[in-house]
Amino acid sequence: MASGDVRINVAVADRILLHLWEQDHQADHYLVSFEMTRPGIAEVCALHPPNVSRAMRELIQDGLVSEYTRTIRGDERRQKTWQLTDEGRTEARNRIEKLRSMMVLIREREGKLLEIRADKAAEHLQTGLTLLQVLM
C-alpha cells in the first residue's frame, strides 16, 4: 500500500547526468543522435532548452560534462552536443544508485496503487522503460 507523499522530484542536473549516462554509448563518436543535442536533452529530460544550457554550463564547470560540435544523424548542420567526462561517469553512477532506490507509485492492472523501488518499476510493469522514464 502507498504511504504518505511520494511525489518524485529529480534535480535538473541528475536528469541530465542520467540521460547522458544512458547515451554514453555515443561518447566520442563523430555522428550522434538527436538525443545528444540541446533540444534532444530538453525533450527527454522534460526541460526548457534554456534550462539545459544553464545546467550544462554548471556541469562543465564542475568537470562532469564536456561539450563538442558534432554531426547529428538526419540533420545537415552540426550542433553542440555533450557527453560525460570520466569524473562525470563516476558521479553519474553514484547518483544513479540513489535514484534507483527512490520509491515510486505505479498503478497495477486491477487499479491498485503500489509503492515500489524505481529500479523495479519497469520490470514489474513489463515495459522497456529506462530509469529516467520511470522517474519522470
Identify the residue ranges that each predicted region occupies.
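Amphipathic alpha-helical dimerization/coiled-coil segments
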Residues: 90-136
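Short, cationic-aromatic polyanion-contact patches
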Residues: 9-13, 70-94
